[in-house]
Design a protein with these regions (language model features):
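Rhodanese-like catalytic fold shared by cysteine-dependent sulfurtransferases
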Residues: 2-16, 20, 24-28, 33-69, ...
Length: 138
């Protein structure tokens, strides 16, 4: 079976608690795996790509125990796993993935409102973040 790390997955309620600082185990750094050209709508408190680099470099030197939340475009976005592994190899250990991603968050925002599911901007076309359909399934 060998050595393999277990990926820490969290749901939308935990993300809400992180945003509202209702987590008992400290503050979180929130990052995403969306393309640089697709950063106009993010979950509240997400660092910009520039802030992410600077903040990660600072924590890399000073505190690898920082809590890091990663999310992607949707539940099929494998870039979150790549980012998780990259950070793990750098020595970070408190890494969590919000599997639902921005798509789930926006769907919940559409139903329950901006106060419960805040983003940096309002998006009308939620399906922009649904991902590509699987061509193998008919």
């Amino acid at each position: 079976m060998g050595n393999s790390q277990s990926i820490n997955k969290i749901n939308f309620e935990t993300v809400q608690n992180i945003i509202n600082n209702n987590i008992t185990f400290g503050k979180f750094m929130i990052i995403n795996t969306l393309e640089n050209s697709n950063q106009e709508c993010l979950i509240k408190n997400t660092l910009s790509p520039e802030e992410e680099i600077n903040t990660l470099n600072n924590y890399l030197k000073n505190d690898k125990n920082v809590n890091i939340l990663i999310y992607g475009e949707n539940c099929c976005d494998t870039k979150v796993i790549d980012k998780y592994n990259q950070l793990y190899k750098l020595g970070f250990s408190n890494i969590y993935i919000y599997i639902g991603g921005l798509f789930e968050w926006l769907l919940l925002q559409d139903i329950y409102g901006d106060d419960e599911f805040p983003t940096t901007t309002k998006i009308i076309d939620i399906l922009k973040y649904k991902g590509k359909s699987n061509k193998f399934i008919k």
